[in-house]
Amino acid sequence: MFIWTKAPARGLGKASKILPKRDDTQKVFETTHHKQFHTATTSVRRSSSSAKERQRAERQQLTRLLKESPGKRDARNFLKQFDVPKKSKASITAKAKELVSENIHNDLASLRTGVNLGDLYKPTVFTREPLPEESYDAEKDEPVHLALVKLRQPQKLTDRTLGDIALTLSQMARLGLSTAVVLDCDEDTSTHSIEVKPEYGNMVREQALRLVAALEDYNEPGSLLVEDVLGYSPLDNDMPSTNQVRGGVEVQHTYLLFPPIDDGVIPVIAPFAYDENLKKVRVQADDVLLALVREFAGLGHSNGMESPRGSLHKTKRVVERPLLDRIIILDPLGGIPSENRADGAHVFVNLEAEYRDIKKELQQLSSKTSNGAGSPTSLSTGNPLSKFVEQEVVSLPGVQSENLASSAPVRHLKNLDVLERGLKLLPPSSSGLILTPMEAATKAIPDDARTTPSKNPLLHNLLTDKPMTSSSLPTSPTSRFLGSAAPNPATFLKKGIPLTMIPDPRVHGPWQPPSASNPSIELADDPRINFPKLVDLIDDSFQRKLHPKNYLDRIHGRVAGIIIAGDYEGGAICTWETPKSLQGATPPSVLTPDSPYWIPYLDKFAVLTSSQGSGGVSDIVWAALTRTCFPDGVVWRSRTSNPVNKWYQERSMGMWKLPGDQWTMFWTTEGIVGGWEQGKWGDVDDAKKRDMKRWDACIDVCSGIEPSWADGIQRDD
C-alpha cells in the first residue's frame, strides 16, 4: 500500500499490485515498487554494487587530483570530510584474531555441552585475508553524505535546463554527496487548502517524472519518485517545539528513503502526505523539507502511523541514517537580497549574528511592497546603470520580470526562515545554499570546446564549503550589471558563530575617538573581555608569544574597540593612532574620526589556525570591521613577505610599500591623498597644515608602531 515509481530501465526489480485507493473508494490502480525493499536491502545492494564501485572509483580519481595540491586549504578540508576512510592492516589483523578466538571459544563450549558436530560448521581458514563478506562491512564504514534539495517551479524549466541540473546532481554524487530532491510547484506564497485538486496532482506528478527521467540519464544508480513517505496530522503546532514542524508533516516510512539513498538512488519527493484516514493531502514543500531535516538529524518520531514493515526497518535506521551536510534551495528569485551591497544580495549569512537583522529588513521590504510604497525593484542600490539596463536592455533568456513580483520579499523571507530552522537542528559544519536553477545548471565542462568553462556554484560550494564570492570583498556598482531585474546572486548560509563588538556600533554608532564622555576601553580590565583568551588567540594566530604588559602599555588610552567572533575563534583590535609629528600639539576641543590627531588603525587581526580557511571566520570579522565599526575607512600594515597580503590587497582600496621595504601599508579610506579642513587642526602651524595630508599621517603612523612580542626580537609584527 506504499506507492513509489521507478523507471523500468534500471531494473531494481518490479512487481505489480492492485491496491485499494487511500480514500477507501473501490477504484484500483497499478503501482510499481521494489520487491521487499524494506527488508531485503542486500539484493538491492548487489544489483547496484557495480554502479557504486564505479562512483567510488571516479571519486577516488577526483580526490587523487585534489591531493596533488596539498597546500590548498580548501582541498584538504574537502578530503577530510568526503574522502573514503581506509581500514588499516592492523584493524584487519585484529578482526582476524577476534574471529579465531571466537572459534576456539565455540569449540570449548561444544566440548562442555557434549555436542560434537565435527568440522561441519568450522570456518575453513582464519589466518588469510578477511572473508569476502567482511569486505562489505568495510564499505559500510564509509558514511553517506547527503544534501536535501528543494526545486521551486520546475514547470517553468525547459527539459535542457532540467537535464543540466540532473547532471550537476550526478556530479555531486560522484564527489561523495548524495542528494534527495523535494519538489515545490506552487506559483505563489499564499496558503493553500490541503485538498489535492486533480489538475494540481497531475501537474506535480508530471514534473516529478520529468525530473526522475532526467536524473536517470546521468545518475547510474537511478532515481525514484517517492509519494508515500510522509504523514500529516492537523494538530495545532503553535506551541514552541524543536521536534515538531508547522503543518503537522512527519516522515513516517523511513524504509522508503534510507535504502535507496544508501544505494546511490536519488529520491524525488512530492509535496503530498497522508492523514490518519489515509487520505492524500497537499502540504507545503517547506514543511516537507523541515520534516526531512528533522528525520535525518535523528529528531523524527512516529505517532503510530508507521507500518509494520517500517517498524522492522526502524531497528537499523540509526545506523543507516545519512549525514545531512547541505540544505539547498533552487529558487528562480536567487539569493537573499541586500540593499547594502552593490551586487544586490547577501553572499554569506552568519545566521547566529545576522538572522534577526536580515529578517527585519525583509519584513520592512515586504510591508513597503504590500502598501505600494516601494517595489521589489528597489532591491538594487540605485545604480543609474542598473536602472538604465532595467528600462532599456532586454532581459537575458531565463530572466523573467515576474520573478520580482510583489510576493518576492515574502518568498525570500520564507527561504531564510526554513534554512534558519533547518540548520539549527544540524551540526555547525552543515550549511545552506540558495541559488537559481539556472546557476545550478551551469556546466563546469561545456559541451562545446570553444565555450569558456564556468564555475558551477553547487560544485564550487561542495569543494570549498564557501560562497562563490567572499562576503568581505568590496563590491562595485557595476558588479550587478543587469540591475535588480535579474535574479540575485547565490547566498551561502551557516549556523555560524556569535559576533561581539565592544563598544557595539549597532547601539552607539561607528567607533569614535576617546573623549571624556567616551573613554577608551581597557582590554585587561573590561569585564566583557576575557583577556587571557584574547592573548591565546593572538599567540595561536601569529605563532609567537605576545608580551601582554608591553602591549597594554602601548595601546593604553587609544583602544577604539575590539571584535570577537565565537569563543575567541577570531577577532580584531583597533586603536586610534596619532602621527609622531603631531604628538604634543593641542588638538581642537571637539574631535571627529576624520581628524589628523586620530587615525583609525587595525592593530591586530587574528584567527585561530584551526578556523582559518573554513567557517568564514575571517570574512565575518572583516565585514564587521570595515562596514560597521569603521565604515569610513581604516589603515593597517603587514610585513611585505606576509602570504596574507593578497587577501588584504583584495579587500583594500590600495597598498604601498613603506620605506625600508619591511612593511606594506593598506587602507580602505577614500580620498587618502586629501587634506583636512582648517577647523580640525587645532594649535598647529600653517606650514604643517599645508604639508601633511592624510597620506602622510597614515605613513607616519604605520612606520612608527613598535612591536610588543615576548621574544624581544624586533622582527615583523
Curated annotation (Swiss-Prot):
Ranges where the N-acetyltransferase domain occurs: 518-691
Residue runs in coiled coils: none
Cellular-component GO terms for this entry: mitochondrial matrix
One Gene Ontology biological process: ornithine biosynthetic process
Record EC number: 2.3.1.1
Location(s) in or outside the cell: Mitochondrion
Catalytic activity: L-glutamate + acetyl-CoA = N-acetyl-L-glutamate + CoA + H(+)
Basic and acidic residues biased stretches: 51-70
Pfam family for this entry, one: NAT
Positions with biased composition (Low complexity): 39-50
Primary location group: mitochondrion
Region (Disordered) location: 35-70
Transit peptide: 1-23
UniProt function note: N-acetylglutamate synthase involved in arginine biosynthesis.
Family affiliation: Belongs to the acetyltransferase family.
Protein name: Amino-acid acetyltransferase, mitochondrial
Originating gene: arg2
